[in-house]
């Protein structure tokens, strides 16, 4: 009995005569290595279908090419090599290749004062594409931080002044009594409102960038904001965090400008967009600000 040749329907032609921008798969489970740790990722992989008469692409070839990402540290050269394999396996069919990775690596972050440290998750998306020799890579990174409202802080200070005036009206002031008053609940009669906030960074990486600068970008953004959310803390760390919030009062406009200035000076960024969201504790809605920049643009 002769063995039958398995049919390959993707090789058939179509009468539709229409090229397609993107064909592929999304949500592919994949382990990758970043920063020396194994991380679960999801991949979206695809190519353009430029032959208008080709019925489809060979999705299994894309899937198998992704195995290269398991072989070592994830970097831009490895991502580019995978995209090139996408195109090589679709010669005559495709001119553009795309790959998106979604992952949430962990970074160990130190406490502000004490020797404690803990792990913090950084949601990350890597978008890459290749067309000819044109390789583009973009990092989407989310940072969380605390934002204390400058207006609320001013109103709280005014209430403290008024209470001080009431409690000490007509009395001679001495250092000990004022110090005791400032440390009492009667003295700090009001506090400003603050909230957990998020910054969504989309950064186009320069052509000469090789590695994935996750920790660099996280450090850069958190340093600019000054109030990154913490992991393990003692009371001394919590006090230092309260001080950081008091010294870094921020509207959403302030936060996005801080990040803009920091990223503008980052040499590996060719372009970026920033969106900050302050999940208001005073209001039932969010305060949002955005900024965009491209190197060399007027």
Curated annotation (Swiss-Prot):
Species: Pseudomonas aeruginosa (strain UCBPP-PA14)
Q: What is this protein called?
A: GTP cyclohydrolase FolE2
Biological or metabolic pathway of the protein: Cofactor biosynthesis; 7,8-dihydroneopterin triphosphate biosynthesis; 7,8-dihydroneopterin triphosphate from GTP: step 1/1
Do you know which HAMAP family this protein is assigned to? GTP_cyclohydrol_B
Please describe what this protein does.
Converts GTP to 7,8-dihydroneopterin triphosphate.
**What family name appears in the similarity comment?**
Belongs to the GTP cyclohydrolase IV family.
BP GO terms, sorted: tetrahydrofolate biosynthetic process
Gene Ontology molecular-function annotations: GTP cyclohydrolase I activity
Q: What InterPro entries does the database record attribute to this sequence?
A: GTP_cyclohydrolase_FolE2 (IPR022838), GTP_cyclohydrolase_FolE2/MptA (IPR003801)
- Name which cysteines form disulfide bonds: none
Q: Please give the catalytic activity noted in the UniProt record.
A: GTP + H2O = 7,8-dihydroneopterin 3'-triphosphate + formate + H(+)
Enzyme Commission no: 3.5.4.16
User: Which keywords annotate this record?
Assistant: Hydrolase
Annotated site residues (May be catalytically important) in this chain: 149
């Amino acid at each position: 009995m002769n063995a039958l040749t398995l049919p390959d329907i993707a090789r058939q032609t179509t009468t539709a005569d229409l090229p397609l921008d993107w064909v592929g798969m999304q949500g592919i489970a994949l382990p990758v290595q970043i920063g020396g740790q194994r991380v679960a990722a999801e991949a979206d992989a695809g190519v353009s279908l430029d032959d208008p008469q080709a019925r489809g692409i060979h999705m299994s070839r894309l899937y198998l090419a992704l195995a290269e990402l398991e072989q070592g540290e994830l970097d831009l050269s490895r991502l580019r090599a995978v995209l090139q394999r996408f195109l090589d396996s679709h010669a005559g069919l495709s001119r553009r290749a795309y790959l998106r990775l979604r992952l949430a690596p962990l970074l160990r972050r130190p406490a502000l004062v004490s020797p404690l440290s803990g792990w913090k998750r950084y949601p990350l998306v890597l978008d890459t594409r290749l067309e000819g020799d044109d390789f583009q890579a973009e990092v989407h990174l989310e940072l969380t931080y605390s934002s204390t409202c400058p207006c609320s802080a001013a109103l709280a200070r005014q209430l403290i002044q008024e209470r001080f005036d009431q409690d000490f009206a007509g009395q001679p002031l001495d250092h000990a009594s004022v110090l005791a008053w400032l440390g009492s609940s009667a003295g700090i009669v009001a506090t400003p409102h603050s909230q957990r906030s998020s910054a969504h960074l989309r950064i186009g990486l320069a052509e000469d960038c090789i590695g994935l600068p996750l920790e660099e970008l996280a450090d850069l953004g958190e340093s600019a904001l000054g109030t990154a959310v913490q992991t393990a803390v003692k009371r001394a760390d919590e006090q230092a965090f309260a001080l950081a919030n008091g010294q870094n009062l921020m509207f959403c406009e302030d936060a996005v400008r801080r990040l803009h200035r920091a990223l503008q000076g980052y040499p590996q960024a060719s372009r970026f967009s920033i969106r900050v969201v302050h999940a208001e504790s005073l209001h039932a809605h969010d305060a949002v600000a955005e900024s965009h920049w491209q190197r060399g643009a007027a």
